[in-house]
Amino acid sequence: MAIERTLSIIKPDATRRNLTGKINAKFEEAGLRIVAQKRIHLSLAQAQKFYGVHKDRPFFGELTEFMASEPVVVQVLEGEGAIAKNREVMGATNPANADAGTIRKEFALSVGENSVHGSDAPETAAEEIAFFFSGLELVG
């Protein structure tokens, strides 16, 4: 399997509860390396641009307001099959459907406040990483 990079966002519900370290431990235990990381506070306009693919979905306003409500941690994870592995570690979008031991099963408050975001494909991973990081910030 190829070495990949994927974007991970630790969302406001998790940063507010100081879960960054516990969440990152799960990524590292799964064999993913954190090759870039920063804590930022998105503006509403930035959140709307990042989640623009969902602009016509009914949850867009609630999602973007939530993502701009408090700081988030954006990071790049690297490893063999990193995109699929990250999604496995995160668990199902709805924590009620997530497997035991996943981030969302352990830490998510609801389907809306589900603690983490992860890229879903190589193309979106590249776009999402470039949204937050320059090449100089990626050290692996």
From Swiss-Prot:
SUPFAM superfamilies: Nucleoside diphosphate kinase, NDK
GO process annotations (BP): CTP biosynthetic process; GTP biosynthetic process; UTP biosynthetic process
Listed InterPro entries: NDK-like_dom, NDK-like_dom_sf, Nucleoside_diP_kinase, Nucleoside_diP_kinase_AS
Keywords: ATP-binding, Cytoplasm, Kinase, Magnesium, Metal-binding, Nucleotide metabolism, Nucleotide-binding, Phosphoprotein, Transferase
Binding site for ATP: K11, F59, R87, T93, R104, N114
Top-level EC class as recorded in UniProt: transferase
Catalytic reaction(s) noted: a 2'-deoxyribonucleoside 5'-diphosphate + ATP = a 2'-deoxyribonucleoside 5'-triphosphate + ADP; a ribonucleoside 5'-diphosphate + ATP = a ribonucleoside 5'-triphosphate + ADP
Biological role stated in the UniProt entry: Major role in the synthesis of nucleoside triphosphates other than ATP. The ATP gamma phosphate is transferred to the NDP beta phosphate via a ping-pong mechanism, using a phosphorylated active-site intermediate.
Cofactor(s) it depends on: Mg(2+)
UniProt subunit comment: Homotetramer.
Chief location bin: cytoplasm
Family annotation (Pfam families): NDK
Protein name from the UniProt record: Nucleoside diphosphate kinase
Gene from which the chain derives: ndk
Subcellular location field: Cytoplasm
One Gene Ontology term of the molecular function aspect: ATP binding
EC number(s) given by UniProt: 2.7.4.6
PANTHER family given in the database record: NUCLEOSIDE DIPHOSPHATE KINASE, NUCLEOSIDE DIPHOSPHATE KINASE DDB_G0292928-RELATED
